[in-house]
A protein has these predicted regions:
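Type-3 copper protein
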Residues: 1-238, 344-685, 857-924
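Acidic, low-complexity/disordered tracts enriched in E/D and polar residues
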Residues: 2-12, 196-321
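Short, Φ-rich (hydrophobic/aromatic) sequence segments
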Residues: 152, 159-257, 744-806, 810-813, ...
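Segments forming glycine/polar-rich beta-alpha architectures that bind adenosine-containing cofactors
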Residues: 244, 248, 253, 258-268, ...
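Elongated alpha-helical scaffolds
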Residues: 306-309, 326-327, 344-348
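Short acidic, hydrophobic short linear motifs in intrinsically disordered regions
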Residues: 323-335
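Short, positively charged loop/turn segments that connect secondary-structure elements
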Residues: 336-345
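C-terminal structured domains
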Residues: 627-881, 886-890, 910-914
Length: 924
């Protein structure tokens, strides 16, 4: 049994963590604002509010005068003036002054109120008149600032990879317009909006991509509180898109002459079943090379071929020649001799086996540990020991040098290198390999940037205490400040995360399927057949049903998980989710409609955690993406995302920091339960650069159809594994016969498990891998909108940990969108009136749904600065239909609460941390 439990007093993060740092300091976007226009808008709105109070008072006083007067001309004049005041319409000066004189003779108090309103309304009219010129001048200056930002080296380096088309337009865009203050034409405005989105992405968001966002390796240490300092100068690393290598390999294999020289092997893990040969067949669906982000989709399935004399003899040959190189051409010649058949027939037969994956060419695959994929590909070619392969490897030398020079090159040099790289890859395919039309992906390179933290921290293993830093370059976080701010609330919230884990129902279902087949304490030695039967008999149909399931129906009632096996653990999960929703609903109702914040207490979390008892694995290392809001007197830490797994924050960046993989490898020993080992599930050949990483586990599981990347002694074949149910612990245990130890599968890539082939995906149901998006408002009624059509959600926090940011939701029809004929200053003023009326902060992230927008922009939160007309215009361009709905979320932390600095200024940053997991004792 496991030693329980989550010790809330000692839980902390592992001393090594990652910091994701926005590429531009936040000060860079301040120049895009119109501060004087904002002050003008505030003054207008303040004066308007005061005038409304005066107008109400004056209206009442005039009402009394009208009712008490028999002078019909005076009554008509007073009625007209009262209507003007009610409609906030400034009357003509002469007529208003005459009426004011008459009122003064009748009621001095009313005259005083009326005089104040007229004076204020005339002053407001003058102030309103100043808005157009002021806004136009400041908008012009903000456009100049945007043009200046368009030349920022860090922005342009990333932009060249993210949007080459936009990058190519920016030099012309940066030139001053022919006439100062002229409104840009339609094409220029489109460029402006696209550029603005990338500027905000680089200054205000933290998703690593090239130099848009850098990463720094951090450690617990020092005594600087929550303040982090990163380096001003960044270093980058570029790698060729592995899809480009896949296209090269396809071209080599497609050429009969070169194919003859390629070593071949049967699909690993194949076996004989009576009159059939069984193996895992893998299908690869090529991605679209013309899209910016593409990778080849892979699926696998247990497959059978009818045994025949020819196939049996061929497989026997492979067995007899095990450990020696068998080339495709040699195999064709052997078949011709053995069968007495024509070479063409033998080519056709072997080609068919290649097509169905029974025979494979493994040497040209990119594997997860090929952290320099192009150099690895060259090495594989030279290992063929054939003149054409050496020549092809030599032809790839110039593209390889382009890749190596790219990271340190200027933006102009990068353009030339990309052009040379693309031309070189095309030439290799067309000139060297004879391809009619070269296949080269649109995105040729992927790049990551280090924002410091390259020095080795003293200890990368788990534990709450810090180790002294060995170099000043390491980003350091004060452990005492972290413990006080986040350790306890984060540990408490971790206890309820299984309720939100998207993979937990699948893990419970797989265990239920196993128990139905093998019973309590049962054992399965044929995992390949188990996985095949699970998918064939149950899981594929189950996934079809769950894909259409909505967690809550139209009435807000929770919809239970699909539970065809009648599993009590799934019912317990449903109960925990209902409990969470009921407690959140009660919390919301108690807070009232105007609440800005609600607090989840310990009792709330304890009640939900009690329902989850025994559902989650006892070995559950977690990773969290967090942002610190360093507010005076009330600092907060915001939980953005949570994942389960080992070394997840680091794996993608191991090649960026010297020695990081070795330190992480060593650190895992302290978190693995006694009697268990970690073994990586790779998912097979790499189809995305996101899956490249150094070695982080002592072992790897080699699935059928894979060849493995480690030395033989560290490979665990599927045949060596068996699955057994531990009735005492109530869990499934994967064990290795050779090692006589429990094996914990670990996935270190960045693709979602659903994108992996069937067999690795199923093995991960036995791993700590999880995805737990914390949607605290799921199933909680929104409540009625306010008079302006806006509904709100308060911020949700547990202690200093924010679980959900404050938000506002509105249909497009409720927004003060720019309408034909409206003035720019009037439109700007309307937005600030809207913001003020509904209590929105100055800066938010806006998510537009149901827009029909294409690409990532339509789905992701966009930074919106209400003080910038350029930002407002770019946001409005995302709203394509009247049916669109917008959710505004507070920018937390906002720019006044940022805790990460460099010599350039303050930076938006996000911490990627792993929570420390004490060693748990197990007996099986």
């Amino acid at each position: 049994m496991s030693q329980d439990n989550h010790d809330l007093s000692t839980a902390g993060i592992r001393p090594a963590f990652m910091v994701r740092v926005a590429g531009l300091p936040v000060e860079s976007v301040q120049e895009l604002r119109c501060p004087q226009s904002r002050r003008w808008a505030d003054e207008v709105l303040n004066e308007s509010a005061q005038l409304r109070l005066l107008a109400e008072k004056a209206g009442d006083q005039l009402h009394d005068l009208i009712g008490g007067s028999d002078d019909e001309p005076l009554r008509r004049a007073l009625l007209k003036l009262r209507r003007d005041i009610f409609n906030n319409r400034l009357p003509a000066t002469d007529s208003a002054d005459r009426v004011l004189d008459r009122v003064h003779s009748l009621d001095q108090a009313a005259a005083s109120t009326l005089a104040d309103w007229l004076t204020g309304r005339r002053a407001l009219d003058g102030r309103l008149g100043a808005g157009a010129g002021l806004l136009a001048a400041e908008t012009g200056r903000s456009r100049e600032a945007l043009r200046a930002l368009a030349g920022h080296e860090r922005l342009r380096r990333g932009l060249l990879l993210a949007s080459p088309a936009l990058d190519a337009q920016l030099d012309a865009y940066r030139k001053p317009p022919p006439s100062a203050g002229a409104r840009p034409d339609k094409k220029q405005r489109k460029i402006e909006r696209s550029l603005l989105s990338y500027v905000y992405r680089t200054a205000c968001k933290t998703s690593p991509f090239s130099t848009f966002t850098g990463v720094a390796l951090g450690s617990l240490g020092g005594s600087a509180g929550l303040r982090l300092r990163v380096e001003e100068e960044w270093r980058a690393q570029a790698r060729l898109n592995v899809v480009a290598l896949g296209r090269l390999a396809d071209a080599v294999i497609a050429d009969p002459a070169r194919r003859a020289d390629l070593p071949v092997a049967p699909a690993s893990g194949w076996g004989r079943d009576d009159d059939r040969v069984r193996y895992v067949r893998r299908w690869v669906t090529a991605g679209d090379d013309d899209t910016a982000v593409t990778f080849d989709a892979v699926k696998d399935r247990l497959f059978f071929l009818r045994r025949s004399g020819t196939l049996d003899r061929l497989l026997t040959l492979f067995e007899e020649r095990s450990g020696t190189v068998l080339r495709y051409g040699d195999l064709v010649e052997w078949l011709a001799r053995d069968q007495g058949a024509a070479r063409e027939e033998c080519e056709q037969y072997l080609g068919a086996l290649l097509d169905v994956g029974m025979v494979q060419v493994p040497c040209l695959r990119t594997e997860v540990h090929d952290t320099d994929p192009l150099r690895a590909f060259q090495g594989a070619l030279r290992g063929l020991e054939r003149p054409w392969a050496d020549r092809l490897a030599d032809r790839l030398e110039e593209p390889a040098r382009c890749v190596e020079r790219f990271a340190d090159a200027s933006a102009d040099e990068r353009r030339a290198l990309l052009d040379a790289l693309r031309a070189g890859l095309r030439a290799v395919q067309e000139e060297e390999l004879g391809a009619d039309r070269a296949k080269v992906p649109q995105t040729l390179l992927y790049e990551d940037a280090a924002a410091g933290g390259g020095a080795e921290p003293d200890d990368a293993g788990p534990g709450p205490g810090p180790g002294p830093a060995k170099a000043s370059r390491t980003v350091q976080l004060d452990p005492d400040a972290w413990q006080e701010l986040a350790a306890r609330p984060l540990a408490a919230v971790e206890r309820v995360l299984p309720a939100f884990d998207l993979t937990l129902p699948q893990r419970i279902t797989f265990e239920g399927f196993f128990l139905a087949r093998y019973g309590r304490g049962g054992r399965c030695d044929d995992l390949l057949k188990l996985v095949h039967d699970f998918h064939e008999d149950f899981f594929d149909q189950y996934m079809t049903f769950t894909a259409t399931r909505t967690a809550y129906d139209a009435d807000g009632t929770y919809v239970p998980e699909v539970n065809w096996l009648g599993l009590d653990r799934l019912r317990a999960l449903d109960t925990a989710r209902r409990t969470f929703t009921a407690r959140m609903t009660a919390l919301r109702e108690a807070a009232g409609p105007g609440a800005a914040e609600v607090r989840v207490d310990d009792a709330f979390l304890a009640e939900v955690a009690a329902e989850l008892q025994g559902l989650a694995a006892d070995f559950a290392p977690m990773s969290h993406h967090l942002q610190i809001a360093d507010r005076p007197g009330d600092p907060l830490v915001v939980l953005n995302r949570s994942y389960g797994g080992v070394s997840f924050p680091f794996s993608r960046f191991t090649e960026l920091f010297d020695g990081l993989d070795e330190r992480l490898f060593a650190g895992t020993e302290a978190i693995v339960p006694e009697g268990a080992v970690l073994a990586e599930v790779t998912g097979g050949p790499v189809t995305s650069n996101l899956n490249l990483h150094g070695r982080l586990t002592p072992y790897e599981i080699v699935c059928p159809g894979e060849r493995g990347t480690l030395e033989e002694e560290f490979r665990i074949s599927l045949d060596d594994l068996h699955l057994v149910h531990d009735p005492e612990a109530g869990r499934l245990v994967l064990r290795s016969a050779r090692l006589d130890r429990e094996v914990i599968p670990v996935y270190l890539g960045y693709l979602v498990p659903l994108a992996l082939p069937e067999l690795p995906r199923t093995l991960l149901l036995l791993s700590p891998t999880s995805m737990a998006p914390l949607n605290v408002w799921a199933g909680v009624p929104e409540g009625p909108p306010d008079e302006g059509g806006v509904t709100t959600r308060p911020r949700v926090r547990h202690g200093s940990l924010v679980l959900s940011r404050r938000s506002w939701s509105a249909p497009a029809a409720a927004l003060p969108l720019h309408r034909a004929g409206a003035t720019e200053d009037g439109w700007f003023l309307d937005w600030h009136a809207f913001r003020r009326e509904h209590g929105l902060p100055d800066r938010v992230f806006a998510t537009v749904s149901d827009t029909g927008a294409r690409g990532a922009t339509g789905a992701k939160p966009q930074y919106l600065d209400f003080d910038s007309p350029l930002s407002l215009s770019a946001f409005e361009a995302l709203i394509k239909t009247p049916q669109a709905r917008v959710v505004f979320r507070e920018a937390l932390p906002d720019e006044d609460a940022l805790h990460t600095v460099s010599g350039h200024g303050r930076h938006v940053a996000e911490l990627a941390v792993e929570t420390a997991v004490p060693v748990r004792r197990r007996t099986v």
